[in-house]
Curated annotation (Swiss-Prot):
InterPro entries: Cyt_P450, Cyt_P450_B, Cyt_P450_CS, Cyt_P450_sf. It comes from Mycobacterium tuberculosis (strain ATCC 25618 / H37Rv). Its cofactor is heme. GO terms for molecular function: heme binding; iron ion binding; monooxygenase activity; oxidoreductase activity, acting on paired donors, with incorporation or reduction of molecular oxygen. This is Putative cytochrome P450 141. The gene is cyp141. Belongs to the cytochrome P450 family. It is found in: Cell membrane. The lineage of its organism: Bacteria, Bacillati, Actinomycetota, Actinomycetes, Mycobacteriales. Heme binds at C346. Gene3D superfamilies: Cytochrome P450.
Length: 400
């Protein structure tokens, strides 16, 4: 990057499962850099590990301010709803506390056999298929949608419809404002209807717990609860699909790493940490706005400036990780921030780790000879946007 050029986001990503080379370039030469958004606005991007952690824990970088109409319209969803992506302070604390009541250790323990059954069913479908097959279509997508369905206590077809609307509401540049508004209206109507049903007929699921707890405590409005639950859907459908698919692609590309897990299932938990470090779900995080003048890594950001962090880039920082571009399922230590950092860190990290460990343990034991059916170099990126790290398909094969 020259001293006068400003890179445009979304960045080119020649290898779909690898971060854009632009992130490495910025991290090494301009760790706090201006970037151009699809809207034409300019924002700051922070790319080094320590700086990213600093921003994520700094109250002067506000998610709430990013939801103001004067902020760049990066992701329409953020400005449409008071979600976990667009609130700070006591309001955010109340929302997290309510969500934590649903994602408590007891609930996660009760979900473990449910998750195992979902994984087993998906792998049964894989075993019944004639290779080569698209692993994403047969395994990753059904698992992602069924996990969310069980978590929320709804049917998989409902999750599929919710996810379709969320994709539009989270669009960076693919659709127009009118379509975003239409999808958003449908999305809110669906979630409010589900919440009312859960209040009338509660079950042992996240939605029921949240709906009942909020009725008793009255800490949030219906609109705020809807926003919080939509945040869960955003992170709970596309993210596991991308992490499972891209994680497997990395394992099969580095076949010796896959074989280590086949040989010793006890290595899977540590491997999951490397998979999420190496294969993050997003290239940059949601927008924040600086509320007062601040200096990051020698660069002055004035109050009102829009700013992003890149956990993807931070997790490849050579000042934090030895050989950060090497995929090593036994990496230790591995103090990544794949699940975020600070007040807005992922509230479902323990649940996500359990799901991923269950999945990769079962997969490597049932399909020890799984292989890529197409060269790794031929993988294609699914599309551009904030959630742009997915691949179109992952063809796999195995001896029959």
């Amino acid at each position: 990057m020259t001293s006068t050029s400003i890179p445009t986001f979304p960045f080119d990503r020649p290898v779909p499962t690898e971060p854009s080379p632009m992130l490495s370039e910025l991290r090494n030469s301009c760790p706090v850099a201006p970037i151009e958004l699809p809207s034409g606005h300019t924002a700051w991007l922070v790319t080094r590990f320590d700086d990213v952690k600093g921003v994520l824990s700094d109250k002067r970088f506000s998610c709430r301010a990013a939801a103001h109409p004067s902020s760049p319209p990066f992701v329409p969803f953020v400005q449409l709803c008071p979600s976990l992506l667009s609130i700070d302070g006591p309001q955010h604390t109340a929302a997290r506390r309510l969500l934590a009541q649903g994602l408590n250790p007891g609930f996660i323990a009760r979900m473990r056999p449910v998750v195992q059954q979902i994984v087993d069913n998906a792998l049964d479908d894989l075993a019944a298929a004639e290779p080569p097959v698209d692993f994403q279509e047969i395994v990753s997508v059904p698992i992602g949608e069924q996990l969310m369905a069980k978590l929320l206590g709804v049917e998989p077809k409902t999750v599929h419809e919710l996810a379709a609307h969320v994709d539009a509401a989270m669009s960076v540049c693919e659709i127009g404002d009118e379509e975003v508004s239409r999808r958003w209206s449908a999305l809110c109507t669906m979630v409010i209807d589900i919440l009312h049903r859960k209040l009338a007929e509660p079950g042992d699921d996240l939605l029921s717990t949240i709906a009942q707890a909020n009725r008793q405590q009255s800490t949030m409005t219906d609109e705020q609860v809807v926003g919080m639950l939509l945040t869960v859907v955003i992170g709970g459908v596309d993210t596991p699909i991308a992490v499972i698919t891209n994680g497997l692609a990395s394992l099969l590309h580095h076949r010796d790493q896959y074989e280590r897990l086949v040989e010793d299932p006890g290595r899977v938990a540590r491997a999951v940490e490397e998979i999420v470090r190496f294969n993050p779900a997003t290239e940059i995080e949601h927008l924040r706005v600086v509320t007062e003048d601040v200096v990051i890594a020698g660069t002055a950001l004035s109050a009102g400036s829009p700013a992003f962090t890149s956990i993807t880039s931070a997790n490849r920082d050579s000042d934090q990780f030895l050989d950060p571009d090497e995929f090593d399922v036994e990496r230790n230590p591995n103090e990544h921030i794949a699940f975020g950092y600070g007040p807005h860190a992922c509230p479902a990290s323990a649940y996500s780790r359990m799901c991923l460990t269950t999945f990769f343990t079962s997969l490597t034991q049932r399909f020890p000879q799984l292989q890529l059916a197409r060269p790794f170099e031929d993988l294609e990126r699914r599309g551009k946007g904030l959630h742009s790290v997915g691949i179109k398909e992952l063809l796999v094969t195995w001896p029959t």
